[in-house]
Amino acid sequence: MGSILIRQIAESHPERVSSMIMGGAIMKLNFRSQFLIRFGNIVKSIIPYMWLYSFLAFIIMPKKNHKKSRLLFVREAKKLYRKEFIRWYKLTSELNPLLRFFRQVDVKIPTLYVMGQEDYMFLPSIKKLANLHKSAKLVVIPDCGHVVNVDKPSIFNEKTLRFLRKLN
């Protein structure tokens, strides 16, 4: 969700943003993610929200090497109260029009997308977006899932610092 916030700030106040780094960016909800959101909407008031969150974490980050990211994801979710979680979940179901706009409009701000090679839900759309937007660059980190800065922190830092140095 951080990539959505960053991009919204860039749209609203481009004078405040000189560059953007998006790790594990979400710019399109594919069929699978839309199905999961709809499924979650149906069961969110029936099952404990942490079960739903843990299930979603496993679907997004299914591999053994994603375990650290999955556990972090769930641990941070425990800080949310059920009411906050329901509000956050409702927001995700309203994202499609905003994400479509983000994909269609290049903000012309240098942007680095850092994605995990195993981020099967969100990498395909970022590949397309990086090809369409002239200001965007894509780095794909091997053996890495959705939360690239946790799965491979040293490689993530190296790639992002290199991007920032090239801008200066």
Annotate each predicted stretch with a short phrase.
Residues 104-108, 131-133:
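Short, conserved loop/helix-junction motifs that constitute active-site signature segments
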Residues 134-168:
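Catalytic active-site module of serine/aspartate enzymes centered on a nucleophile-bearing elbow/loop
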Residues 7-12, 16-47:
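Flexible "cap/lid" loop of the alpha/beta hydrolase fold
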Residues 120-125:
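Conserved alpha/beta-hydrolase "acid-adjacent" motif
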Residues 25, 116-117, 143:
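Cofactor-binding loop segments of dinucleotide-utilizing enzymes, especially the Rossmann-like FAD-
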Residues 107, 113-115:
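Short beta-strand/loop motif that positions the catalytic acidic residue
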Residues 31-33, 50-105:
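Conserved alpha/beta-hydrolase catalytic His-Asp/Glu region
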Residues 2, 6:
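Gly/Ala-rich beta-loop-alpha elbow adjacent to hydrolase catalytic centers
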